Amino acid sequence: MQKLEDMNLIDNFLFQEVARNKEYGGEFCRIILETILGREIKEVEIDVEVEKSIPGATLESHGIRLDALVKERDPRRMEVSTGSGAATYFDLEPNNYKISDPARRGRYYQAVVTSEHFGKGLDYKYLMDTYVIFILSDDPFGEDRMMYTIRNGCVELPDMPYEDGQITIFLYTKGKYAPSQELSDMLKYIENSREENVSNPSLQRMSDMVRETKRDRTVGAKFMMWWDYEADMKRHAREEGLE
């Protein structure tokens, strides 16, 4: 049985528990996003929703469960229609296993996040920007790159601006060609969240959060229930011949 103390941030249970913490969850997500995007996120409000379930449009359609959905609301960019700051949504998805059909998975996550948070009757110019970010221990495309950034564009005119506000990022923890040393170090720590992999102040802060989360008795109790549930699901899958 895996112990909570041995879990890494690439394990979605630990990632979710750090992100949902009311004291430091927003700061945790801010550090991750700033490192990935290479820019500061400041003078903004950050709301974090963890393990958010979004049902399909009908009972027969496919729903998803988001690991950590972060809303960056910037009061400097006011939306005329709502009178509030313009929002950008970031869906953070750590996965310690090989995901199937990453391109189409990313497409579906984008569609669901957008439709869930775009208000009825709003003009399309108010459609929010959305980032779906997968953090993976397995290379999704087999090109051995640390970062794959996916944007839509025009085939005939690849240099033509086509800003639809939709970006999907796949991060491979062991990949090459890192856009920054900070990102490389952070992904190494996310995959193996040990003190020896702390190499800068931001990672030290993340490590402090991880340590506090693992010491939380409430998290420990939730982990035991989560482990029992996962074990039951695997047992049922074996019995049904699905695993």
What are these model-predicted stretches?
Residues 1-167, 177-179, 236:
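Accessory alpha/beta interaction modules
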Residues 1-6, 13, 69-86, 90-95, ...:
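Short, charged alpha-helical interaction segments and adjacent helix-coil junctions
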